[in-house]
Amino acid sequence: PLPPPPPAPPPPPPPHPPPRPSPPGGPPGAAPPAADAPGAYADASEFLADLRLVESSLARHRGEHAGGFAVRRLLRRVQAFGFHLAALDLRQESSQHDAALAALLDDPDFPARPWTDRAQRLRDLVAGTDPVPKPDATDAARVLDVFRTVAQSLPRYGARAIGAYIISMSRSAADALAVLALARLGGCLDANGAVPLDVAPLFETVDDLDAAAATLRSLFADPVYREHLRERGDRQVVMLGYSDSAKDGGLVASRWALQQTQVALTALAAEAGVRIAFFHGRGGSLSRGGGKTGRAVVAAPRGSVDGYLRLTEQGEVIHRKYGIRALALRNLEQATGAVLRATLRPRKPEPREAAWREMAAAIAAAARAHYRGLVYETDGFVDYFRAATPIDVIERLRIGSRPSKRGNAGGVSALRAIPWVFAWSQNRCGLTAWLGVGTGLVQGIERFGHAAVAEMARDWPFFATLVDDVEMVLAKSDLGIFERYSRLAGDGHARFFPGIAAEFERTRGAILALKGTQHLLEGDFRLRQSIRLRNPYVDPLSLLQVDLLARWRAAGRPEDALFHALVTTVNGIAAGVQNTG
């Protein structure tokens, strides 16, 4: 037989392909976005439709074990995450919008004009009847770029990729109209020419919460904004600020203002045919709205939950509540159960609630007067605060998403709520959660009688939750250790410490009297025992921090080994005390 022929030589390698064109803003040679590829899904709903087709086909042809479970799992993931993974909320302070509009309109006095005048100008901008004198104003570029980015992102990642547009420090209807005007100027419009964003005013201070109903009434009556709401399904998102309202008026005044605002806005929305969705801007500490989510939901006004709950979870509590699968499921289960109970609760008010509201209003007013009298109206208190707390250390820590202060002012008003609360928890005083509470309760008992206030604290979920929260902070506070911090203030110690200590004891005595107990947390053995076990480890850190603060300040506050040791004590105390920021 003839030998086999020799093997054919290998084919020459193909020529090196030319580099792929880069997408706008992408690195050289990067692949084009999948959304731009031929045959790509336009949005997640198309992908879901195909997955459901596969699922039904497997079910019809006995293919359960040929991938049915995997398909259902992928279906759930697409339903939860779409093509975007997580929705991104947008947030900007109203003053930034006003500054941008002043530049675009070439009107430096625009922010100072009455809100009614600003609102009319903004309506004209939304309608396109008012030309913009300086559409390329550089001072407005940063604000407009946000809307341009949204306009580019929505077609690519889907409508669920962008959440609410939150306007912090909202004070009038003009603040919401400003978002619509800027969105149009930035080209952020859908196929119907509407702004594809939920505009969410954020009411933060006690005064702004009190005025929230008037603001929304003006918005619901505004034809331009009402048309926007119709495009958004007649659903209005409102964010409620727990942090700044408590810093502004104390815990009782803040909680009462939030309660009243929800009652008023729920009724107003029902009257206007709008479904209202409250977004609770809660923090990790009691002074910033923290606490047990389930109890807070059940204590919400009747009709305000309506099957919906949205709230912020702070970074320092996410791991504690959701870091372990079993804990995450338990927390979500408790929140879901609370929403169901609150939603199914009869809308008919409790017969005693009118009297309770009168008492709560009086207690809140007295508590706020005492709180503001010390914090905002007493000369020298800011200096005492800066000496008796480690605020000068906290201001240097790079742990927040925003600067510790608004602007360059040095008073309490300019300080953000997070460092304000954090500083008072570090020195073991917890003042932000109970200052004024004792005065308010004592005056309420004197005016309405002990039995009436005790009944309210027992039977009204709103007030019972408030009293329990304050009791927990009192149990975590240690006036003996706080006194050592207070002495760092020199002459300020003799001036301020006695009054603070007296209010602490007044609050403690009033709560024990209302509950008919001898000791704090008598009804919560697990929490009381947890505090007793943690404190022996936290106390040495607190004493060490006092010593380090004195030495570091005497040395001129350098960023040296003393400072780094102070940072370590801050972290340790925060971990031990919990509910700190």
Where are these regions (language model features)?
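Extended, highly charged clamp/arch subdomains and adjacent linkers
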Residues: 1-7, 18-91, 98, 103-112
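Active-site-proximal structural scaffolding
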Residues: 47, 51, 67-71, 94, ...
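Conserved, mostly hydrophobic/aromatic
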Residues: 82, 201, 284
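Acidic, glycine-enriched catalytic cores built around paired aspartates
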Residues: 84, 89-91, 96-98, 110-135, ...
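Active-site cores of enzymes that catalyze phosphoryl transfer or operate on phosphate-rich substrates
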Residues: 86-88, 93-177, 181, 185-190, ...
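Secondary-structure transition/capping motifs at alpha-helix termini
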Residues: 155-160, 183-195, 219-234, 263-277, ...
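Catalytic cores of alpha/beta
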Residues: 211-215, 288-296
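Metal-dependent DNA phosphodiester-chemistry modules and their immediately adjacent helices/loops
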Residues: 222-230, 234-247, 290-293, 302-330
